C-alpha cells in the first residue's frame, strides 16, 4: 500500500478566531522604543549588553536600546538618532561599538526568554519541553546584497538566513545566522544544546529541511525525541531494526535494515560524539 497522511484540520472555532480579532483591535498603539524600555523594566535584558573591556552594564540605557533598535531595523546610528529625541548618533554608535556583540545579544535574548518562561501565563501554551525549529530567509538590499548569497528555492534575489528554535511557550531559545545555501539539518542540534536559556527541551519538531539520517540517529543517542514533518512521505523509505515483515502494511516503505553490527563496532566513538 501507499502511505498517506491526511493533514490535520484546524481546531480553532470560528467564534474563537473572531474573538481574537476583536481583542487584538483593543490593543493600544505603542511606539517600539517605549516597548523596548518597558520590556527592559520587566526583564533587565539591557544589562546583558556588558562593556567589552570592563564587563559593566551600560549606563545609558536609552542609547543602548536605540542601538538595539538601529541594528534590528538596519537604520544605523545617524538615521536612528534623527528619529529619536535626546539621543545622538555618537551615543548610539558608542553603545554599539562597546556593548553590542554577538555574545551580549545572545545573553539578552536568553534573559527575555527566561523571564517569559517563568511567567505563569506561559504555562497556558505548554511546559517548555517541546519546541520547533525552522529557517527564515530575509532578502537583502542595497549594499547588503553584495555580501549575501542566493538560494533559488527563495528566488533569484540575494539574502541572509536565520535558523531559529521556538519553544511551545513561544519563547526563542536559539537564533543562528546561517548561509542560505547550507542545509538546516546541520544546525538542529547546535540550537538545541548550545543555548543559554533555562528551557529543557525533550522533543523537537522540524520540517523536511531540518532532517537527515544523522539527526535521526543522534537524537536516539542523546535520549531526545525527533518529530519531523516530512514532505513527500509516500516516496520515502524507513529503516528499522526489525525484519521487514514486522510492518506488513508498510512493506512498500521499508528500506534496508539498520546495520546493528556496524553500530556496535563503533559504539564507543558514537557515545563520545553524542
How would you describe each model-predicted region?
Residues 1-83:
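Structured, charged N-terminal subsegments at the starts of enzyme catalytic cores
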Residues 10-17, 51, 58-59, 70, ...:
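A generic structural signal for ordered alpha-helices
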Residues 82-120, 151-268:
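Catalytic or ion-translocation cores adjacent to nucleophile or general acid/base/metal-coordination motifs
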Residues 110-149:
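Structured nucleic-acid-interacting core domains from mobile-element enzymes and related host factors
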Residues 271-274:
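Charge-patterned, long linear interaction tracts outside catalytic cores
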Amino acid at each position: 500500500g501507499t502511505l498517506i497522511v491526511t493533514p490535520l484540520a484546524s481546531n480553532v472555532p470560528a467564534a474563537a478566531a473572531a474573538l481574537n480579532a476583536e481583542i487584538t483591535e483593543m490593543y493600544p498603539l505603542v511606539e517600539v522604543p517605549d516597548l523596548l524600555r518597558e520590556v527592559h523594566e520587566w526583564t533587565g535584558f539591557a544589562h546583558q549588553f556588558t562593556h567589552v573591556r570592563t564587563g559593566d552594564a551600560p549606563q545609558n540605557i536609552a542609547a543602548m536600546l536605540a542601538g538595539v533598535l538601529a541594528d534590528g531595523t538596519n537604520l544605523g546610528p545617524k538615521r536612528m538618532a534623527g528619529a529619536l529625541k535626546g539621543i545622538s548618533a555618537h551615543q548610539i554608535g558608542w553603545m554599539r561599538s562597546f556593548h553590542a556583540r554577538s555574545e551580549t545579544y545572545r545573553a539578552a535574548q536568553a534573559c527575555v526568554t527566561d523571564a517569559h518562561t517563568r511567567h505563569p501565563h506561559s504555562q497556558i501554551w505548554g511546559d517548555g519541553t517541546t519546541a520547533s525549529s525552522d529557517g527564515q530567509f530575509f532578502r537583502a538590499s542595497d549594499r547588503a546584497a553584495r555580501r549575501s548569497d542566493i538560494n533559488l528555492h527563495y528566488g533569484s534575489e540575494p539574502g541572509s538566513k536565520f535558523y531559529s528554535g521556538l519553544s511551545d511557550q513561544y519563547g526563542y531559545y536559539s537564533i543562528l545566522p546561517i548561509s542560505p545555501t547550507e542545509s538546516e539539518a546541520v544546525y538542529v542540534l547546535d540550537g538545541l544544546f548550545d543555548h543559554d536559556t533555562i528551557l529543557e527541551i525533550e522533543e523537537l519538531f522540524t520540517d523536511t529541511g531540518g532532517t537527515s539520517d544523522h539527526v535521526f540517529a543522534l537524537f536516539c543517542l542523546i535520549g531526545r525525541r525527533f518529530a519531523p514533518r516530512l514532505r513527500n512521505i509516500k516516496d520515502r523509505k524507513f529503516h528499522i531494526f526489525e525484519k521487514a515483515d514486522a510492518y506488513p502494511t508498510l512493506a512498500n516503505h521499508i528500506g534496508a535494515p539498520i546495520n546493528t553490527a556496524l553500530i556496535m563496532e563503533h559504539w564507543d566513538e558514537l557515545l563520545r560524539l553524542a
